[in-house]
From Swiss-Prot:
It comes from Arabidopsis thaliana. SUPFAM superfamilies: L domain-like (SSF52058). This is Receptor-like protein 47. Pfam families: LRR_1, LRR_6, LRR_8, LRRNT_2. Its main location: membrane.
């Protein structure tokens, strides 16, 4: 785990509070056969309103039986005296479908606790929710709900806990400010509420100035929205408030806490990533918050005086991107500090030696500054005996590489520095190391064989000068992400990767690996990204008689190698994820590493999209589905099964020796944005069906043997002519070459124009011969106005 128990308690305080609220309001099931018939009917009707993908062991409603006591059903609790349902907790139950306004749920009038979190309700939250007048706890987190938050929630006078986070609720409408006012008015009516979480929605507007009227409020989270205006100082006047999370909004300055008359109980405050700039906030403004243990002011221009002090129990401090130019000296006295993030500032020089003597320090992120070394001896960091996470990436550190705490270190990030020489063998002594990122340095030599002692989940050595054969024994079977791209590795791809059943990301691009296609990788059930680009792989990319099936692959890049052979027509049949939005288990694919925040380390892949090289990072991995086999020696027909991959966004098969026709099945790729079939030997015509691909922005058919007219569709006609050049038989726009039918029609039209021209010219000549000059002038003027032809203008200029 990343933090000690005290920091974990601080970071997860809102979840702890949530548990307390839920347990406080919980009523245990007692005697059997207490369920009233109308209650059972309402529950059974509610169950039947939703679809549940089968089979799902976590779907509680699938275990309900109509011939049993409903008070014994999973997720249901009844009042032991009356038999009415008072609690319904069906979170993570795979319920699919809208929550209807006439749902049987709303007949459960005695319901006090309703938890439907992490289901796929997908619709609006109906006003009928306000009919559950006795409701104390309402949790609809992550339910795919959207639209306005119903004002009827203000009728729930007993409500103490409201969690609508991670949905798509908005303040939009004909009167968005009016909608927001109704929302805030509704919140202010909840006089008993102790917990409000509206985080990660799409709400906007300003908070009311009289927030202190929520006198019992203990937790208020509206992070990840678009609220604006100033943060009302009345929030800090609520003596019961423990958690206040306003981060990732559009709040602006000035920021004031106000005069706090009674001791503050606030323990967690996050106002980071707002729009206070260019306003400067003095860090000392937080000094009166004596109970504060978690403070995140990331993204705010801070003034940190030499005499500033924060409450001594501060354990979590987020100072990311605060325009700090000097290492904050007040941290020296923060003996309880466990989590420190001062990344993305403007700090230069050496990291102070005293930092590593803070006894509780677990997480340090000093990345994206201009540090060039460490004060003290080579083993200075080993003074931080409890250090779990160290991020020193994107600085100008150079040799020697620091010695690290042997026992505690879990995650090490040191990319984008100036370290050189061999990778230090002292890293092999870090028994608990799980993530190692040394990308974008100048390391050279081979991989230390002692890596076999490590149990890594993530190994990124990208863009160094490492060489030699990658040792088989250095591959941890725990690996989930492996990136050694842009080095000088040679030999074969390590076969020990076959033992990495959890691997999702595999990138060996731009090395000198000389091997046949690793078809055995299809046995890795979680592989999503495979990049073999720019190596010396050779031979066919399939084995005769075997069907290749990369069921979860979303990025397949084997370009710029020496692969050969013909692809069978069914080559892409087993590529399930590229054929569908969901994977074979019906789950949305997301790139994750078990137990690891995926934002902790940088993953990147260089892709060719629309003819340009781009770097794919972050969320791009969950969006892009790409196939690139360009720059090889593949031949024969393009497999017809390519049409099954309807989710593919980028498809490049250029610079091969493909023959035959362009398969019409390509028109099934409804999400395709970029198509490159250039530099092959394709013949026949360009299928007109491709013009129906509304997202297709870029295509290249050049340097083939295509013929016939270019389809006259908007998607194709808007392409540059270079996308069709070097196809001798192609004709029509955007090429200058006219098609045969067009040339014949044009010639006939020109002949008709010439005949008409000759007739009119004969008439003019006769008129000139018989009519005096004045009449001739009038006649010419009349014809000029009537016909306005270019040739006639030339004749007029001749006579004048």
């Amino acid at each position: 785990m990343m933090h000690s128990s005290s920091v974990r308690r601080m970071i997860t305080v809102k979840w702890s509070l949530c548990l307390i609220f839920c347990l406080t309001n919980s009523i245990l099931v007692s005697a059997k056969h207490l369920c009233l018939p109308d209650q059972k009917d309402s529950l059974w009707g509610f169950k039947n309103e939703f679809n549940v993908p089968s089979p799902h062991s976590y779907a509680m409603t699938e275990k309900w039986r109509n011939n049993t006591d409903c008070c014994s059903w999973d997720g249901v609790s009844c009042d032991p005296k009356t038999g009415v349902v008072v609690e319904l907790d069906l979170q993570y139950s795979h319920l699919n479908g809208p929550l209807r306004s006439n749902s049987s749920l709303f007949r459960l009038q005695h319901l006090q606790k309703l938890v439907l979190g992490s289901n796929h309700l997908s619709g609006i939250l109906p006003d009928s929710i306000g009919n559950l007048k006795r409701l104390k706890v309402l949790v609809l987190v992550n339910c795919n709900l959207f639209g306005k938050i119903p004002s009827s929630l203000g009728n729930l006078s007993y409500l103490t806990h409201l969690d609508l986070s991670y949905n798509d609720f908005t303040s939009e409408g004909p009167d968005s400010m009016g909608n927001l006012n109704r929302l805030t008015d509704m919140l202010l009516k909840l006089s008993s509420v102790t917990w409000i979480d509206l985080g990660d929605n799409q709400l906007k507007g300003m908070l009311p100035s009289n927030m202190s009227s929520l006198s019992k409020l203990e937790a208020f989270d509206i992070s990840g929205n678009s609220f604006s205006g100033t943060i009302p100082s009345s929030l800090f006047m609520i003596p019961s408030l423990i958690l206040l999370h306003l981060g990732r909004n559009d709040f602006s300055g000035p920021f004031e806490i106000g005069n706090i008359s009674s001791p503050s109980n606030l323990q967690l405050l996050n106002i980071g990533r707002n729009n206070f700039n260019p306003d400067i906030v003095d860090l000392s403004i937080f000094s009166p918050l004596l109970s504060l243990g978690y403070l995140d002011v990331s993204g705010i221009n801070l003034k940190i005086s030499s005499t500033v002090s924060l409450p001594s129990p501060i354990e979590y401090l987020g100072l990311l991107s605060c325009n700090i130019s000097e290492f904050p000296k007040f941290l020296r006295n923060q003996t309880s500090l466990e989590y420190l993030d001062i990344s993305a500032n403007q700090i230069e020089g050496q990291v102070p030696e005293w930092l590593w003597s803070l006894p509780e320090l677990r997480y340090v992120n000093i990345s994206h500054n201009s540090f060039n070394g460490f004060e003290g001896p080579a083993d200075v960091i080993q003074g931080g005996r409890e250090l779990l996470v160290l991020d020193i990436s994107s600085n100008i550190f150079q040799d020697p590489f620091p010695l690290l705490p042997v026992v505690s270190m879990n995650y090490l990030f040191s990319s984008n520095n100036r370290f050189s020489g061999e990778i230090p063998k002292t890293i092999c002594e870090l028994d608990n190391l799980r993530i190692l990122v040394l990308s974008n340095n100048n390391f050279s030599g081979s991989i230390p064989r002692c890596f076999e002692n490590l149990h890594l989940y993530v190994l990124h050595l990208r863009n160094n000068n490492l060489s030699g054969i990658f040792p088989e024994e250095a591959i941890s079977h725990h690996l989930q992400s492996f990136d050694v791209g842009h080095n000088l590795f040679s030999g074969e791809l390590p076969k020990s990767l076959i033992n990495c059943s959890d691997i999702e990301f595999l990138n060996v691009e731009d090395n000198r690996i000389n091997d046949t296609f690793p078809s055995w990788l299809e046995l890795l059930p979680n592989l999503q990204i495979l990049v073999l680009r720019s190596n010396e792989f050779y031979g066919p990319i399939f084995s005769p008689g075997d069907s290749l099936s990369f069921s979860r692959l979303r990025i397949f890049d084997i370009s710029e190698n020496r692969f050969t052979g013909v692809l069978p027509s069914d080559y892409f049949v087993g590529w399930s994820v590229m054929s569908s939005v969901v994977d074979i288990d019906g789950r949305i694919i997301q790139y994750t590493v078990t137990g690891i925040d995926r934002d902790f380390y940088h993953k990147s892949v260089a892709l060719i999209n629309k003819g340009l090289k781009m770097e794919l990072v972050g969320s791009g991995f969950t969006i892009y589905k790409t196939i690139d086999v360009s720059g090889n020696r593949l031949e024969g027909d393009i497999p017809e099964s390519i049409g099954l991959l309807k989710e593919v966004i980028v498809l490049s098969m250029s610079n091969n020796a493909f023959t035959g026709h362009i398969p019409p099945s390509l028109s099934n790729l409804s999400n395709l944005q970029s198509l490159d079939l250039s530099q092959n030997r394709l013949s026949g015509s360009i299928p007109g069906e491709l013009g129906k691909l509304t997202f297709l922005e870029w295509m290249n058919f050049s340097h083939n043997r295509l013929e016939g007219p270019i389809p006259e569709t908007t998607q194709i006609q808007t392409q540059d002519s270079s996308s069709f050049t070097e196809n001798p038989g192609l004709c029509g726009a955007p090429l200058l070459k006219k098609c045969g039918g067009e040339e014949e029609a044009t010639k006939q039209e020109q002949d008709e124009d010439k005949e008409e021209e000759d007739q009119v010219f004969s008439w003019i000549a006769a008129a000139i011969g018989y009519v005096p000059g004045v009449v001739c002038g009038l006649t010419i003027g009349h014809i000029l106005v009537s016909h306005k032809r270019d040739w006639f203008m030339r004749i007029v200029s001749f006579f004048t």
